[in-house]
Amino acid sequence: MRKRVLLAVVAAAATGLTVAPLTASASSHREAPLIAEDPLADNTDLYAFVAPDDPNRTVIVANYVPFENPAGGPNFYRFGDDVAYQIHIDNRGDARDHLVFTFQFHTSTVDASTFLYNTGPIGFNNATRTYTNWNRPQTYRVTMTNADTGSSAVIGSNLLSPPDVVGDRSTGSAQNYHMLARKAEYTLPGGFKVFAGQRDDPFFANLGGVFDLLNFSGATTGAEDYLAGMNVHSIVLSVPSGMLTANGD
């Protein structure tokens, strides 16, 4: 199967960290006509910030699959098996790749006789490290490439992506879902930390007004966030900050 490649670029220079999204035929929050036909490959936003629990680490978040309505059916929201999601790091400020992280996903079907996303309340089996009653689980692998030498190494494989939020009967309360999602957090060799799964979309915008010829006059009660309550699929990569800057500066 020929994989499509989606790029998220993090450029770091000695003067500071600059972050800019760069994608192959993708744009922000589905306003570009072509990528609207391929939401699994739509890179909505890219964020980078100092880890709240460790000032020596930087968290990079690349979001995909915009406008995930929790009531819209979980079958439609996932990472694409035919997409190679990539984060490129320029840590010298020369506009060239030096480190590339590639995330590749695989979806399996537990019971092919049903179309159901889950066949009962989704739980987690600590002994087998698998989610229970989830009929469409996703796993992924992470490959790190040194673009200077051309060498690549798989730094994580058969990693779990958590199930989507379906509802109280399927994924339990918000607290229960939080515990389910935490099972999909990983620390990998080299000090990398990763998570890939559904999250609340943090982007704030009056998109209704934007698409209505920049009509913001109706916002009489203050700012309007048309993305409130919507989710995205996030690829989260935490790295030692020294990897993002020239000479560790």
Regions found by a protein language model. Give the residues of each.
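Bacterial N-terminal signal peptides that target proteins for export
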Residues: 1-9
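Bacterial N-terminal signal peptides
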Residues: 8-18
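Surface-exposed extracytoplasmic segments
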Residues: 22-249
